[in-house]
């Protein structure tokens, strides 16, 4: 016979600071920082700092662009950011046990997952370079972006040999890199007033 009760809760606490700067609607700077703490990680591994920065140059507002009538918008963008992931079960850093009652005695057996005290935040670094363009007073717009995304310390469940007494453990294993180019275009073909 099994004895059991469950009460599972986790907490995420965040501190966020952001600064924006705009000079003459031509030059833009943004800096953001998040300091996140999650109860899903063991003491000493709970907090992660995740900054991001971006800059843009609105070339269409420059004096040398005033005389032309082809481009109604031209903006160059550059961005970098670090994002954290804590998408794991609560208490993955603990080895959890079930209580069993047999012949009047209570015994404890592992639930199957081995706790991992040193798991920490999975992190994703994002780099982006882009350009926004507008033609015919904004009736046609286009954006071109090149990006590079690198994930490291992936939070994954690893199978363990049954001889260990456990079936799995959550660990920071692996890395993924994703890169590409995106293009989008919009048009207002018919405009009524």
Predicted feature locations:
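Extracellular/periplasmic, surface-exposed regions of secreted and cell-surface proteins
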Residues: 1-193
């Amino acid at each position: 016979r099994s004895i059991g009760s469950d009460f599972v809760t986790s907490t995420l606490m965040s501190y966020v600071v952001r600064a924006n700067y705009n000079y003459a609607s031509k030059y833009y700077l943004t800096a953001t920082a998040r300091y996140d703490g999650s109860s899903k990680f063991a003491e000493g591994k709970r907090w992660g700092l995740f900054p991001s920065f971006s800059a843009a140059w609105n070339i269409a507002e420059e004096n040398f662009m005033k005389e032309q009538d082809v481009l109604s918008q031209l903006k160059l963008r550059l961005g970098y950011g670090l994002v954290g992931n804590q998408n794991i079960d609560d208490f993955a850093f603990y080895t959890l046990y079930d209580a069993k009652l047999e012949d009047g005695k209570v015994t404890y057996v592992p639930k199957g997952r081995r706790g991992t005290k040193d798991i920490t935040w999975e992190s994703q670094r994002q780099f982006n370079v882009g350009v926004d363009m507008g033609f015919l007073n904004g009736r046609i717009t286009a954006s071109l972006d090149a990006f590079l995304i690198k994930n490291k310390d992936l939070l994954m469940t690893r199978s363990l040999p049954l001889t260990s007494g456990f079936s799995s453990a959550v660990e920071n294993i692996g890395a993924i890199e994703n890169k590409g180019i995106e293009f989008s275009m919009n048009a207002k073909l018919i405009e009524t007033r």
